[in-house]
Amino acid sequence: MEYVYAALILNEADEELTEDNITGVLEAAGVDVEESRAKALVAALEDVDIEEAVEEAAAAPAAAPAASGSDDEAAADDGDDDEEADADEAAEAEDAGDDDDEEPSGEGLGDLFG
């Protein structure tokens, strides 16, 4: 990441994007420079207009969350949520009563742990 920052600094200072300039900026920042990475960065950015790339990145909108339906559908569903919640609670209460018929659990745990 620091290599990209070095390229942005050089671009902002209207300096030429060369291996020597990248190395100089990174060394001034106390970074151990890998010559191959500096060379690769210069080659990768050779045909890139950095100003344009920065503007495009800044103008890109954030992804919006997906809509679940139209406003008409949402208005029609408003009253149903409470009924569905009540039905779910009733089903859970019935399931809770069924646990009395079962034997205490834990007897088969010895098989799991040897």
UniProtKB/Swiss-Prot annotation:
Keywords: Ribonucleoprotein, Ribosomal protein. It holds the Pfam family Ribosomal_60s. Residues 56-69 have a biased composition (Low complexity). It comes from the Archaea. GO terms for biological process: translational elongation. Residues 55-114 are annotated as: Disordered. GO terms for cellular component: ribonucleoprotein complex; ribosome. Residues 70-105 have a biased composition (Acidic residues). One of its GO terms (molecular function) is structural constituent of ribosome. Forms part of the ribosomal stalk, playing a central role in the interaction of the ribosome with GTP-bound translation factors. Part of the 50S ribosomal subunit. Homodimer, it forms part of the ribosomal stalk which helps the ribosome interact with GTP-bound translation factors. Forms a heptameric uL10/P0(P1)2(P1)2(P1)2 complex, where uL10/P0 forms an elongated spine to which the P1 dimers bind in a sequential fashion. This is Large ribosomal subunit protein P1. The lineage of its organism: Archaea, Methanobacteriati, Methanobacteriota, Stenosarchaea group, Halobacteria.
